[in-house]
């Protein structure tokens, strides 16, 4: 295996199959586009395990992902994709950047989920864009933007119910998609779904169970991740 990419939270390696990559989850934590950094023991293991449970569940509901196989505590094999330069964000309750941008009190539920795009470019601060921007930046076609939003809404509906069953409120989340290397006409869910990419609040207490514990210096970051993993594995 040869390393071919390293991001903030994961590394990618080649495998014997040119259309399959090995994805390794790191213990690194970042916030503010990398301005704040730390390492947490077992973070990679927990995020990998949480993503695996969620992706398998989504696959069972008909959502196509890049998942191929579980490998070990911190590695999975995934289909090789060309990641679209878009983060697709779904918001059910006001929090984070939405509350800051729009002056809406954190915890305010939305009448309907809000779906947003952000353009993946750290040097620009990952700006929020609309479908027209995405088209002009060659990030996605109009048809692909419609597909991405529809897929995001489907994922949201499934995840809301899934997390509710384990006592968690899905506040918001971001996901990424990629074109399959072996068939670029197919776009699948890629990257990860974990407390790094979701806001999850305990239904009974309202306690934050996600990366906001790191962003906001709330402490007990890994204890929260471990609790999320435990609930999901007991449910699965």
UniProtKB/Swiss-Prot annotation:
PROSITE patterns: SAICAR_SYNTHETASE_1 (PS01057), SAICAR_SYNTHETASE_2 (PS01058). Its EC number is 6.3.2.6. It holds the Pfam family SAICAR_synt. Pathway: Purine metabolism; IMP biosynthesis via de novo pathway; 5-amino-1-(5-phospho-D-ribosyl)imidazole-4-carboxamide from 5-amino-1-(5-phospho-D-ribosyl)imidazole-4-carboxylate: step 1/2. Keywords: ATP-binding, Ligase, Nucleotide-binding, Purine biosynthesis. InterPro entries: SAICAR_synt/ADE2_N, SAICAR_synt_PurC, SAICAR_synth, SAICAR_synthetase, SAICAR_synthetase_CS. The keyword Nucleotide-binding applies. SUPFAM superfamilies: SAICAR synthase-like. GO terms for molecular function: ATP binding; phosphoribosylaminoimidazolesuccinocarboxamide synthase activity. One of its GO terms (biological process) is cobalamin biosynthetic process. It catalyses: 5-amino-1-(5-phospho-D-ribosyl)imidazole-4-carboxylate + L-aspartate + ATP = (2S)-2-[5-amino-1-(5-phospho-beta-D-ribosyl)imidazole-4-carboxamido]succinate + ADP + phosphate + 2 H(+). Gene3D superfamilies: ATP-grasp fold, B domain, Phosphorylase Kinase, domain 1. It is an enzyme of class 6 (ligase). Belongs to the SAICAR synthetase family. NCBIfam families: purC. PANTHER family: MULTIFUNCTIONAL PROTEIN ADE2 (PTHR43599), SI:DKEY-6E2.2 (PTHR43599:SF3). This is Phosphoribosylaminoimidazole-succinocarboxamide synthase.
